[in-house]
Amino acid sequence: MTINRRHFISASAGITAAMSAPMVFGASRPQVVIIGGGAGGATAARYIAKDSKGAIDVTLVEPTRSYYTCFFSNLYLGGFKDFDSIGHTYGKLANDYGINVVHDWAVDVDSNGKTVALAGGGSLSYDK
């Protein structure tokens, strides 16, 4: 199955709804891993963390340290803004919303084991 925007949004909504329910087993916070820190991934991470008020542990996997948005890029192309003005780092997500930002490539998702393997050799576990 290929992932498109509609599948991503419906999966994100399902994850948010499932994770918002009280935990029946265990005392740890639910784990959500989001792969990709573009406009969609960063926004999903932000709102899951914000709306859960810290009840969900959100990790964002993104190999680059900054993101250059296509929003307002026409202002750069027209000479009204410099290139750095359309760049964003992930520090605000980490500092303001408590999101764990991992700068690495996700190379495999094991849906049965609920883990995400990283290119650097580590792995992340998730709940839903």
Regions found by a protein language model. Give the residues of each.
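Core beta-strand elements of the Rossmann-like FAD/NAD(P) dinucleotide-binding domain
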Residues: G122-K128
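SH3/SH3-like beta-barrel fold
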Residues: V116-L118
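A conserved short coil-to-beta-strand element within the FAD-binding core of flavoproteins
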Residues: D104-G113
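Beta1-alpha1 glycine-rich phosphate/pyrophosphate-binding loop at the start
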Residues: A27-N100
